[in-house]
Structure formats: structure tokens, C-alpha cells
Amino acid sequence: IPDPEKIGTLGKMFRFFYSYLIYTSTTKLLATMGTRPDEMPPGSRHLWPFKTFIANTFGRSRFIKTQIIPLVFNAIFDKNHFSVLFDKYHPDAVFLPHMLGWFDNLLLREAKNRGVKTIGMAANWDHIDKYFIPLQADLLLAQNELIKSAAIRDQAYRENRIRLTGYPHFDFIWDKKYLMERSDFLASTHVRLPSGAKYFLYISGSVYCPDEPDVIEEVLNWISAGRFGPDVYMVIRPYLGGRFKDRDFDDNKFAGFAKHPKVRMASRESWKAVEDTIPLLNFMAHAS
């Protein structure tokens, strides 16, 4: 799959254009301030007037969003990157769990060109109203009413092509059968704390919050001074992240706290499997 940063000048210009066919409050934040100190807004923050112009002119046309953009996308990005897989498996349908992602964009293109039905989903709550997505799935799974409304308003979906699903993972979070007794959890290898201990759970924001060590250090000073009572600790869960540099950033950021007597580091399990999520569920449930 080609790197989206290596698709040529024409491809980059087209991606820039269709991305700003919407300009919501989220888009404005990304276009003017950015959300990461290590990355500038696409094209620089000074282009925000041009980005709003695209949204307020071309972005008002449903025809451009649903007809012209897919046509041009198909013409510019014309390589069949998934042809081997489709020829081998002949799928009846394709599920796209990350509609905003470049990988899913190209997979969706291949499926549409072959007449294969597609089901799409936003991988995160802000993916539908952040940038315009160039291709539509035949059926979009929306986790809540806000995502459904954004898909209709910003992504030009018809209501009859959207299904509300809720967040199935929330059912797991609320299921008491996965909760351990507090004393057992504190004694487990995940925590190793005294049975009567209390702890703050600090969930990292990674490069989005580069000054977190200052906050943690101040709280640890309060803990050491006894401001919260005896046997109080801090559990730090590093940002899960999707980028290796985010993980490296967190590893370096929290390295100085790993050996602090009042700190426990939560392991960085993903949410991909139930057994990997159980420790985090218990960390949240038993935090003081």
C-alpha cells in the first residue's frame, strides 16, 4: 500500500481538496492550532481561510461529494493494490473498520470496482466530522446518534444506509463478571500493592500532553507529603497510541517514574481482545 505521503503532487493536492469539503469545529482546531506539538496543521495553519472556502463552496454540493470525488479518486489512485486478495478469496462483502484511514480508502475503492458489498465504521468518535471521506460504504455502522447525524450532514450519507449499533465494548466494561475482588487485584502481578492501599489512575495523553511529567511529579509530591492519607499510590497507564513514535515518547516521558516507590506502571494492553482489557477494567473500577 503506498504511503499517503508518497502519492505524488497531484494525489496530495486532491487529498487536500477533498479532505476540506467539510469544516467543522474539529476541523477548525486541526487546521489552525493542531493537536500535536510535533506536527503542524496540514499545509500550515495559515491556509485555514482557503480550507473554509473549499467547505463553504464545493463542500455544499452533494453531487460533488458523492459523484465527482469518487470518480476522481478512482482515476488518480488507479492501482489495484488488493487484486491478489480479491482474486483469491472472492469475498461477498468487505468490512472496513477505519473509514478515515488510507488503507481502508484503497480497499473500499477495490471493492466498489468489483461490485463487492461494503460495510464501514468509524474507528473513533471524531472520524466522521473531522475530514471528508472520499468514498462511501454501502452500509455505515454508527455507534451513536451524533455519529449518525454527522454522517448525514458532513459525509452526505442517506439515512437508510446507516445503522445504529451502540458501543458493544461498553457492555463488557459494565459486566461485573470480569471484576476481580479489590484485594485480589491489588495483590496481583498487575499492581502489587498492599491490601488497604488507594491509588490514582493516571491515563496518559502521550504527545498530545508533553508536560504530563510536571503534573505527575506535583501529585507525587502531595502523595509523599501525606496530603491524601497513608498508603496512597499512583498507577500510570501509558498512552496506547497507534504510532511507534508515540509509544517511544511515552517510554521516555515516564522512564523517570518507573522506579518511584509510589508509582506502579500499568501494562499497555490493547482493546483488541477481552483478556487484554480485563486489567484496565479493574484498574478503572478499583481506583480511589
Where do the model's predicted regions map?
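Conserved N-terminal ligand/cofactor-binding loop architecture of enzyme catalytic domains
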Residues: 1-82, 88
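Conserved catalytic-core segment of nucleotide-activated headgroup transferases in glycan assembly
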Residues: 170-270
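Active-site donor-binding segments of glycosyltransferases and PAPS-dependent sulfotransferases
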Residues: 1-25, 247, 255-258, 262-271, ...
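Conserved acidic residues
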Residues: 90-92, 138, 198, 279-282, ...
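Structural alpha-helical scaffold elements that stabilize or flank donor/cofactor-binding regions
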Residues: 85-87, 133, 193, 274-277, ...
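Active-site-proximal region of nucleotide-activated glycan assembly enzymes
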Residues: 69-73, 77-80, 89-93, 97, ...
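A donor-sugar binding/catalytic signature common to diverse glycosyltransferases
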Residues: 120, 142, 274-288
